[in-house]
Curated annotation (Swiss-Prot):
HAMAP family: Arg_succ_synth_type1. L-aspartate binds at residues 121, 125-126. It comes from Legionella pneumophila (strain Paris). Keywords: Amino-acid biosynthesis, Arginine biosynthesis, ATP-binding, Cytoplasm, Ligase, Nucleotide-binding. It catalyses: L-citrulline + L-aspartate + ATP = 2-(N(omega)-L-arginino)succinate + AMP + diphosphate + H(+). GO terms for molecular function: argininosuccinate synthase activity; ATP binding. This is Argininosuccinate synthase. It is an enzyme of class 6 (ligase). Its EC number is 6.3.4.5. Homotetramer.
Length: 405
């Protein structure tokens, strides 16, 4: 017997798609009650207006959940500690999806709903990220993905459906780009950006100044870290949200943190995206510099070898996985002594190191100096070299003439 769905929690953004999903869900699930869940991730939108729109569209309730601080502490700071970049470029702003799914599930369980729904399309990665997280957190909940089942195939059809159901559709030109925004980044896709042979127009950028319009004087910023986590900017301890907002403003005006990428989507296609993440770029640079000072060679190299694995699991939405828990445990150990201060200069899109120090620095000038010293006996190197190169020497002797094929 088919399960009767009487109440549905919907991850709601306020856009056209999720707005028409409210009446569509009520029609296709025997007038089920729909509860809208809106997450405040720092996207700088009028969330009260979005809540009212959800209610006007037919939702019985609409929750607005401020998750900015939780987003920074439980998601972004672990990402900074990991140093992970998807395909060595993408700053992973869609790390927000598991958090949205988590809040959707929490409210779903509180409201005792039968099912949850999301507005991700059948072509993108987000459907995987949302549904993986939901299944990991609450496998008993049914998941509804209208884009994979309904008959609406275009924006024009969606507008017609909205008007037929009394949903207000603003009379404005269609945005030239599809955007996603949170406190960590802004992404831009679609329009002219779909052609990788075309240069990115300056009008794409919202958070970052084009390099041609940046100040002609550098700006110095100083970041303090404690166990791999940023805790202060320019000597002032700030909340995670305030630190990100301030650093986004400072780095953004210097044209820092723009990535023009053709990425491999999880679902198989390649897509071009423009990503703005000024604060993220600076934090990653500062953290990487501090790690170079505080981690041993073998620890640093092992951590670097795992960064793509971590990036992949974040990109794929596998936040609530055993693999991620295991990697976090390793990373947390590596970060125990990543504490210190990093000075950087921001100038014309560049992040320039300007000094760093740490009470746990493994750099000792008396060992590294090129001047005369009484600490390092250079004769000791001979025995090490003999042992280190022994296998190469034996191979050459056996195969005569050093033929390495």
């Amino acid at each position: 017997m088919k399960k009767v769905i009487k109440k549905i929690a919907l991850a709601y953004s306020g856009g056209l798609d999720t707005s028409i999903m409210i009446p569509w869900l009520k029609e296709h699930y025997e007038h089920a009650e729909v509860i809208a869940v809106i997450c405040d991730l720092g996207q700088q939108e009028d969330l009260d207006a979005i809540k009212n729109k959800a209610l006007k569209s037919g939702a019985s309730k609409a929750y607005v959940v401020d998750v900015k601080n939780e987003f920074a502490i439980q998601y972004l700071w672990p990402l900074v500690k990991s140093g992970a970049l998807y395909e060595d470029q993408y700053i992973l702003g869609t790390i927000s999806r598991p958090l949205i799914a988590q809040k959707l599930v929490e409210i779903a369980l509180t409201e005792e709903v039968n099912a949850v729904a999301h507005g991700a399309t059948g072509k993108g990665n987000d459907q995987v990220r949302f549904e993986y997280s939901i299944k990991a957190l609450a496998p008993q909940l049914e998941i509804i993905a209208p884009w994979r089942t309904w008959d609406i195939k275009s924006r024009q059809e969606a507008i017609v459906y909205a008007k037929a159901h009394g949903i207000e559709v603003p009379v404005t030109p269609k945005a030239p780009y599809s955007r996603d925004h949170n406190i960590w980044y802004i992404s831009h896709e679609g329009g002219v950006l779909e052609d990788p042979s075309q240069e990115m127009p300056d009008d794409v950028l919202l958070m970052t100044a084009p390099v041609s319009q940046t100040p002609d004087e550098e700006e110095v910023v100083v970041l303090d870290f404690k166990k791999g986590v940023p805790v202060a900017l320019n000597g002032q301890e700030l909340s995670p949200v305030d630190l990100l907002n301030s650093l986004n403003q400072k780095a953004g005006q210097h044209g820092i943190g723009v990535a023009d990428i053709v990425e491999n989507r999880l679902v198989g296609m390649k897509i071009r995206g423009i990503y703005e993440a000024p604060a993220a770029a600076v934090l990653y640079k500062a953290h990487k510099l501090l790690e170079s000072l505080c981690l041993t060679r073998s620890t640093l190299h092992l951590k670097q070898s795992l960064q793509q694995t971590y990036a992949n699991l974040v990109y794929e939405g596998r936040w609530f996985s055993q693999t991620k828990q295991a990697l976090d445990a390793f990373i947390d150990v590596t970060q125990q002594h990543v504490t210190g201060c990093v000075k950087l200069k921001l100038f014309k899109g560049n992040i320039i190191p300007a000094g760093m120090h740490s009470p746990y620095s493994l750099h000792h000038p008396e060992l590294a100096t090129f001047e005369e010293d009484n600490v390092y006996n250079q004769k000791d190197a001979e025995g090490f070299i003999n042992l280190f190169s022994l296998s190469a020497k034996i191979y050459s002797q056996v195969h005569q003439g050093g033929n390495y094929d």
